């Protein structure tokens, strides 16, 4: 059975059999047979079990992420000309679902998803995450409390995506956000259209460009940091320094030698990596020739792991070369754009003849009559 059929069967089972199917999959995959809803007591217990220093670190990072994202939204775009009003208005999505992997808990991802959602004005947020030994990760619950998320379910995997999309054990959501394994990705792909999705996120990637000025230890550590995410992760080193090319000997790192930094960046544009890191002299002068990357980190104090945690930039990024057409997660992903038009009589009459001609070309008779009646 291929992955499409495997995932499709689970989604269909959950859609048709509801909570009974969720219980079966929770027992089979998570060894869990309890209730799905996380209680206030569980959230309180998680809060009490976290050390003050850990809370301070989480709050500091929370504030940095909030500060970075709060100015992304530039407001409504309304233009008034000749008595006409045209523009774009923005509205938050009514209800979203956040998926946070539970088996290898990454609570930082919840901040990267939840903070821009709150800034966007999303009122209703549901969180699904798989339990480990019957419990949700305590840091995930603490961050959910900071975000004001009270609707939390102990549901993971494909069944969580199906539950959020079809409203099993909860109200259905309008859009699902969050990374997962290949099965979760396939589930998101299959429910798209029933609900929205943020994207399809694969294994982590880093492409590091270094010139002869780069610190060898920084290069090695930064490349290995992304391989730490799992065996399917990718790491590329592109350098115009033969010394660095020869000294960096790491398993599972693909190395390329190019004559110049510009040529190195051109190769990186072809790779279109999730993370592009520049350890070169004067990196800013190369920024304008970078076309394809989920995120760019520059300078000796800008390693990718710092971006993963505390720089404030979002770490939910396009993978698998999808940076050719996709972007980093922002506040706008949690909003809808709605076009607005209120033409004046003068504006309408000055252009309606063109509209009538186009309606005739397309043989749209009622379109023609609708406009003609106003002349």
Swiss-Prot record:
Pfam families: Histidinol_dh. CDD domains: Histidinol_dh. Keywords: Amino-acid biosynthesis, Histidine biosynthesis, Metal-binding, NAD, Oxidoreductase, Zinc. NAD(+) binds at residues 99, 159, 181. PROSITE patterns: HISOL_DEHYDROGENASE. Signal peptide: none annotated. Its EC number is 1.1.1.23. This is Histidinol dehydrogenase. It comes from Picrophilus torridus (strain ATCC 700027 / DSM 9790 / JCM 10055 / NBRC 100828 / KAW 2/3).
